[in-house]
């Protein structure tokens, strides 16, 4: 739902997403708003379905985790900062906070909800949460690099819009080479958080490395 809403004319105003027309282009703006709303509600419906967990305390914790990541202390707050960026001059710490909220919060929630379902105690989740926060930031830096120097045909969407809108990004503030090094350093740091899991964390580390090597 967040991508549908992000593409709306009142937000990022994108016509293409992964090589296909965005929902408001394929249908209309009202349909896009309602489709996003419906998918948002569906997420909570799924989390409280007995096939996910029959334990009401686990269900409540899952709902709270996603709600916190979606609201003003998470994605919505990050999007509000992003909208304000068109008329503001953000420094690197502010951009980092923006992206931790806009991109990282939901990604972190995805990892934390897996820990909740796996019955990992709250005080033992820090390694997983730190891993998710690092790859969330690495993902956004990689996204900024793709927007700066990527191929629109591969990306399936318009690129270089942040530059056109005068928004600060990791690339504009750090330069492409430094941003690329930072993304890779974050990936290695993320994998370091999982070191005590041994080979069991291999898939998660592979995912982290894919995030910064992708071309779309």
Residue ranges of predicted features:
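Mg2+-dependent prenyl diphosphate-binding active-site environment of isoprenoid biosynthetic enzymes
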Residues: 1-142, 148-192, 200-212
């Amino acid at each position: 739902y967040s991508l549908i809403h992000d593409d709306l004319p009142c937000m990022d105003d994108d016509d293409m997403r992964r090589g296909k027309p965005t929902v408001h282009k394929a249908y209309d703006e009202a349909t896009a708003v309602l489709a996003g709303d419906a998918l948002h509600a569906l997420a909570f419906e799924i989390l409280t379905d007995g096939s996910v967990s029959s334990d009401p305390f686990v269900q409540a914790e899952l709902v709270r985790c996603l709600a916190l990541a979606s609201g003003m202390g998470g994605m919505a707050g990050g999007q509000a900062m992003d909208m304000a960026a068109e008329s503001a001059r953000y420094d690197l710490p502010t951009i980092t906070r923006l992206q931790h909220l806009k991109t990282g919060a939901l990604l972190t929630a995805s990892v934390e909800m897996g820990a909740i379902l796996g019955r990992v105690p709250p005080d033992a989740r820090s390694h997983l949460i730190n891993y998710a926060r690092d790859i969330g930031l690495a993902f956004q830096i990689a996204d900024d690099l793709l927007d700066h120097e990527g191929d629109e045909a591969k990306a399936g969407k318009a690129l270089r819009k942040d530059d056109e809108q005068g928004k600060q990004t990791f690339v504009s503030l750090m330069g492409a080479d430094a941003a690329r090094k930072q993304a890779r350093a974050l990936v290695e740091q993320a994998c370091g958080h999982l070191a005590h899991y041994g080979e069991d964390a291999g898939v998660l580390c592979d995912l982290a490395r894919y995030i910064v090597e992708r071309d779309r």
